[in-house]
């Protein structure tokens, strides 16, 4: 499983948290099992392989961190979504942006460019081209404004390598 696939699985879980009353830990306990992956994997190839320990740890950190910092991340989205009310933003796009912003803010081992590029690639799978451009614009503005070093921070070559 690649880091990008693990990120996408985390985004699915973050998206799901927006519809229920479950905590991040409750959702992770229910979803992060080999049995659940096998069940989902019958219809969704992304889940065909259960994550190894490192990948599972990454997914758990993303889901827990994004969930616990949700209000802060939503404030960033609202700040950079000029002309858009937060309620108008598609839920999947919001989950994607929250995840990328969490990685930029709280996961220093993930290059900013890798978090943003992967988020845009994932958005292309689920959203219209207009929403993908919106996601790219929000994340780009966020990083350029909040983190001046964005231009100098390289993308890891191994971002899509098997881990």
What residues fall within each predicted segment?
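N-terminal interaction/assembly modules
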Residues: 1-132, 136-163
């Amino acid at each position: 499983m690649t880091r990008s696939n693990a990120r996408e699985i985390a985004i699915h879980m973050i998206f799901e948290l927006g519809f229920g009353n479950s905590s991040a830990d409750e959702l992770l306990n229910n979803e992060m099992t080999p049995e659940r992956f096998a069940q989902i994997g019958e219809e969704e190839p992304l889940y065909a392989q259960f994550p190894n320990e490192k990948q599972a740890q990454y997914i758990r950190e993303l889901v827990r961190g994004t969930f616990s910092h949700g209000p802060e991340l939503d404030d960033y989205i609202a700040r950079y979504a000029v002309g858009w009310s937060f309620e108008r933003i598609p839920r999947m796009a919001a989950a994607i942006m929250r995840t990328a912003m969490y990685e930029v803010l709280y996961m220093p081992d993930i290059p900013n460019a890798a978090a943003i590029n992967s988020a845009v690639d994932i958005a292309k799978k689920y959203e219209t081209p207009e929403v993908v451009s919106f996601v790219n614009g929000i994340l780009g503005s966020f990083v350029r404004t909040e983190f001046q070093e964005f231009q100098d921070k390289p993308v890891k070559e191994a971002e899509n390598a098997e881990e």
